[in-house]
């Protein structure tokens, strides 16, 4: 296999012939990300890592999930506050967050799953889970709604503030809910 030289510059190869003769591939330098940029990163666990690295380098990143007040006696949101792993692994779940933000759909009050309690071990054995966000769980429908609203507020604030949107995708199966045609977030 022939060696290819990669060159970052302000000007791309004007012709394919130039690449063939020089074996140099010139890629443009995009200067979209600046120290004062506001970046919204959503998607797979890679988006979590990107948010962490950008924040370490002084970039203002959104959503600011770690700012969500957590009450583990009432609800759980991912692994917050230790890790901001609010992940969305497929395009349907990500699209639904943007649709929710733009008012295209609103989650119904009774749109949740009753699941076996493996979090608090309550006497009734059930807790309530948001089908559209991974590991958002409440002890009651009311505490689940509070958790859903807190995640929505953080997500919406990020969408309003951001200048750059970065979306990452995971590789996962997609589950469409029969009752309303929406897609669950694993």
Identify the function of each model-found stretch.
Residues 1-186:
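Extracellular glycan-modifying ectodomains
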